[in-house]
């Protein structure tokens, strides 16, 4: 009987991936901005800090409003939240002026 060679580990090739050497950077690190070369302290620090703060605010603004209407279920699927609008008939106290004008229109039509 011939001995069978061990089967190649094909599943390792499909499921195990090589790690990428450099991860994707989504934002800049604050350490890069704080280390200014040999420039005079105080003159450019305020300008770079304000630019850096402006960039951070833009990043925060984008992420704050991005997924508010989407809910992730336990299975990992995204579900859109449906908003139910209330009509004026259900909430007449929202616009009391609309109620008085509607009553005046009905009186004049009679």
Swiss-Prot record:
Taxonomic superkingdom: Eukaryota
Classification via InterPro entries: PRR15 (IPR028237)
Biased composition (Basic residues): 65-85
Biased composition (Polar residues): 100-110
Disordered, as annotated region: 29-51, 65-110
Family label: Belongs to the PRR15 family.
Record protein name field: Proline-rich protein 15-like protein A
Species the sequence originates in: Danio rerio
């Amino acid at each position: 009987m011939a001995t069978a060679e061990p089967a190649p580990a094909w599943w390792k090739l499909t499921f195990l991936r090589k790690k990428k050497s450099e991860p994707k950077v989504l934002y800049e690190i604050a350490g890069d901005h704080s280390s200014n070369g040999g420039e005079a302290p105080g003159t450019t620090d305020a300008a770079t800090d304000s630019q850096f703060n402006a960039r951070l605010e833009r990043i925060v603004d984008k992420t704050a409003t991005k997924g508010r209407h989407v809910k992730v279920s336990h299975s990992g699927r995204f579900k859109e939240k449906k908003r139910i609008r209330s009509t004026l008939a259900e909430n007449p106290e929202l616009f009391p002026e609309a109620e008085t004008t509607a009553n005046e229109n009905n009186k004049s039509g009679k």
